[in-house]
Amino acid sequence: MRYWQFVLFIITMFLSTSCNKKCENKVVTVSIDTLSLHDGDLIFREGRSTESQVVTSLDSGSYSHVGIMLHTKDGWRVIHAVPNETENDLDTVKYESISSFIQPDKCIKAKVIRVSSNKKITKGAIKYALQKVGMPFDKDFDITDTTTFYCTELVWRAYKHVGIDISKGRRHHINLLGFNKTCILPSDIMPNETNCTLSNKSAHPKTYI
């Protein structure tokens, strides 16, 4: 079963819950303490899209999307793989400003996680992610396919490429109506949320590997 067939099933299954949750989410501005950011930090967000509702319904955590950050002369940028974000957007690996990544119509809350590594490793992970910008979004959620990427797969592969498994082997096994996949979801690459400070107004880095 293709990605969008699966999404339509989940939408039907969770429609009432998703709509109620979405209505309850107030539009707030999420701020990031950019002075404390490092290259290679992972930024998680809970989004407002239907796809985000699907992910949080299937996952054990409260975040639906993730990207890897890089500081440039134009400010902080995020490399991330995202589907169907705007009506005219292609479903690809994107490279955009952090302000766009956390703008209120996309983001309910955000959290930044730091991967413990040296500058050489971080540089290698970022280089890998940058090389994938423009490549297609993985609509089949096939972790064995290195020509397409979904968000958690991209950041996982970026660090795996330089020798760090940020998932520590954790996976979600999804088997619903012919959609039978082993996937990496946001909670698989995130520390236990009870050990982290969460806020819908700001995000501060936490070291976990």
Feature roles, as predicted:
Residues 19-209:
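Cysteine-nucleophile amide-bond enzymes
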Residues 1-25:
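Bacterial Sec-dependent N-terminal signal peptides
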